[in-house]
Curated annotation (Swiss-Prot):
Organism domain of life: Bacteria
GO terms (BP aspect): CTP biosynthetic process; GTP biosynthetic process; UTP biosynthetic process
Protein name: Nucleoside diphosphate kinase
Annotated localization: Cytoplasm
Species assigned in the record: Frankia casuarinae (strain DSM 45818 / CECT 9043 / HFP020203 / CcI3)
Length: 137
């Protein structure tokens, strides 16, 4: 089975609540391997590029403000079906609809502050990894 990579962001709410270890632990226990990890406060230009698909939506400004409001942890995990596996661990975008046992289902209440971002496809993962970790490929 081929190995793929995915980008995971522990958003500022997850970092401030001390949930980085929980996120990393769940990824590792699932069998994914960390290949890059960085604590950083995101530059607005990077956030706008990352969330560019939402630029015309009314929540875009709030989304960018939130993701740049404090430190986040950006990481790259790899393994077979890494995107699908990590999305399952993260849970639905709306934490109220996220399954119990998922990160969002267990630890989040608000769509706007839902702890974690995970790439939604291998193609998105490549684009996002190139943005956050240039030259990693």
């Amino acid at each position: 089975m081929s190995v793929e990579r995915t980008l995971i962001l522990v958003k500022p709410d997850g970092v401030s609540r001390g949930l980085v270890g929980e996120v990393v632990g769940r990824l590792e226990r699932k069998g994914l391997t960390l290949v890059a990890l960085e604590l950083r406060t995101l530059e607005r230009s990077v956030a706008e590029t990352h969330y560019g698909e939402h630029a015309s939506k009314p929540f875009f400004g709030e989304l960018v403000d939130f993701i740049t409001s404090g430190p986040l942890v950006a990481l790259v995990a790899e393994g077979p079906r890494a995107v699908e596996a990590s999305r399952g661990l993260i849970g639905a975008t709306d934490p109220v609809k996220a399954a119990p046992g998922s990160l969002r289902g267990d630890y989040a209440l608000e769509i706007g502050q839902n702890l974690v971002h995970g790439s939604d496809s291998p193609e998105s993962a490549k684009r996002e990894i190139d943005l956050f970790f240039p030259g990693l490929s």
